[in-house]
Amino acid sequence: MHVVRLSIHRLRRFHTVELHPSSTLNLLTGDNGAGKTSVLEALHLMAYGRSFRGRVRDGLIQQGANDLEVFVEWKEGNGAAGERTRRAGLRHRGQEWTGRLDGEDVAQLGALCAALAVVTFEPGSHVLISGGGEPRRRFLDWGLFHVEPDFLTMWRRYARALKQRNALLKQGAQPRMLDAWDHELAESGESLTSRRTRYLERLQERLVPVADAIAPALGLSALTFAPGWKRHEVSLADALLLARERDRQNGYTSQGPHRADWVPSFQALPGRDALSRGQAKLTALACLLAQAEDFAYERGEWPVIALDDLGSELDRHHQGRVLQRLASAPAQVLITATETPPGLADAGALLQQFHVEHGHITRQAAAH
């Protein structure tokens, strides 16, 4: 899939601006603070229902404005069914978020997230490796959400059961009142974990060659999954039963896929705790690119890839390796930088450049 029009209204420093990117490589340059990141942020907002830079109170809506709007038009599908155009709109005002997809109102923003797939690498992406388990669970679930149509229904089933069980635990409910929710949690949780396990195994097969291509010195060799309970010893139903009294005392569910995690392994490093910040960023980027490749294989088309502030996140050597990998893929890529990365110097006709300044985006003449 590739975006053909991105229209942004009253978001951060932009009042009204429109971007028509090419279907290959796109570079947005400009001084720090010019608004380059906000362009990718708008796209991310549509694809994830949240910003990668913090909450709305952090200045997402333009100062003095009451709302923001983002519109995206993109092409998708290139198989037997042919290519089709899709359109989505997102509006935020006060505490309300509303969305439209292909001319129809959506009941939940998840419909927009399911329609438009964007893989984003930004300055905070290192938390995928160096942070807590939540971003790593979210990473797994994003991949499954986009390649397995029934995954969201199953995920919601588990989340609902977990919420109900935790509410009963906080109330000090009698054990018999937990039985039904334990059954629901165990059944949906086992299924959720099986999907995550298979996905991570598949992802590992893609990740190792990707990491070797963009950062061979890392020696990234494997991904290890921790399901959230001792699954090799007991079923989730038994784990919940064994932990029931402790959970009643603590007021929350201590076992299950909501506690799952995964960790990368390296040939020459003791583990992720030994990674420098730069190594954590490279590992995170390798994971994101492997996920994009898996999406492309399963769906028959690439997601949009957004790389924010590439020059400050990676040194010239690794920039070159990443860009070489991306240039060989039929993916639409949007990159922001203060100046043209050396790795794009020879991109030629594949590269479309834009300049961002004073809340405006100017398309520059194509390179020859």
Curated annotation (Swiss-Prot):
Gene3D superfamilies: P-loop containing nucleotide triphosphate hydrolases, RecF/RecN/SMC, N-terminal domain. Transmembrane segments: none annotated. SUPFAM superfamilies: P-loop containing nucleoside triphosphate hydrolases. Signal peptide: none annotated. GO terms for cellular component: cytoplasm. One of its GO terms (biological process) is DNA synthesis involved in DNA repair. Keywords: ATP-binding, Cytoplasm, DNA damage, DNA repair, DNA replication, DNA-binding, Nucleotide-binding, SOS response. GO terms for molecular function: ATP binding; single-stranded DNA binding. It is found in: Cytoplasm. Pfam families: SMC_N. ATP binds at G30, D31, N32, G33, A34, G35, K36, T37. The RecF protein is involved in DNA metabolism; it is required for DNA replication and normal SOS inducibility. RecF binds preferentially to single-stranded, linear DNA. It also seems to bind ATP. Belongs to the RecF family. HAMAP family: RecF. This is DNA replication and repair protein RecF.
